[in-house]
Amino acid sequence: QKTLIFGHKNPDTDTI
């Protein structure tokens, strides 16, 4: 399950 890391430049790829 992908959780978006808000505040990053690429919210589509910056996931945990």
Swiss-Prot record:
Enzyme Commission code(s) on record: 3.6.1.1
Superkingdom in the source lineage: Bacteria
GO molecular function, one term: metal ion binding
Cofactor(s) required, per the database record: Mn(2+)
Binding site for Mn(2+) 2: D14
Similarity comment: Belongs to the PPase class C family.
Protein name: Manganese-dependent inorganic pyrophosphatase
Annotated source species: Priestia megaterium (Bacillus megaterium)
Underlying gene: ppaC
